[in-house]
Amino acid sequence: GKMTYRTHPHNGDKVSILGYGWMRLPRMKNPDNPNEEIINQEEVNRLCNKAFEYGVNYFDTSPAYCQGKSEESLGIALEQSGRSRDSYYIATKLSNFSPTQWSLEAGQQMFENSLKYLKTDYIDYLLLHSIGGGGLDNLRKRYLDNGLLAWLMEQRAAGRIRNLGFSFHGDVK
């Protein structure tokens, strides 16, 4: 079959209508600790390559997925694919859910770690993760009062974030 793509009306990105979510990945027993399961990176790499073969070019991850290992796994899979960075889109999130992560410095570190783990110098789509959690008060604490949103806007202006948005889980109240 042939993949269908949609062109983003504001930035011209030609994105596959099927994206690959990196929230749940194949697992295996850890050879060093049989009581622990780890990501089966070999299988993940195979699935990533298969997704590329079918025309998928949009990959969604988060620092919170797979016990914090999702971004690193995606970075490895994309690197081993041999594809050029401009041939796919990475969406990740600023997943600063815990009050211990609400400082400007913690948010900056989370973003810098995402770049490192994903083996890239820019993020195509960065989402403020689940902004509905805790209502407007937590939104202010996570992104506004600490200056993090302003800093992220600076990163966008510098080209380190191509598109900045949010994800929301909750009701309209």
Spans of model-derived segments:
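Compositionally biased, intrinsically disordered low-complexity regions enriched in proline and serine
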Residues: 6, 21, 90, 123-126, ...
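N-terminal binding-site loop/beta-alpha segment at the start of enzyme catalytic domains
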Residues: 1-88, 150-151, 157
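Glycine/proline-rich, positively charged
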Residues: 29-31, 36, 101-173
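Residue-level signal for alpha-helical context at structural boundaries
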Residues: 77, 91-92, 144, 170
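Structural motif corresponding to the early beta-alpha repeats
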Residues: 81-104, 129-132
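Active-site beta-loop-alpha junctions enriched in small/polar residues
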Residues: 23-25, 62-64, 93-97, 128-131, ...
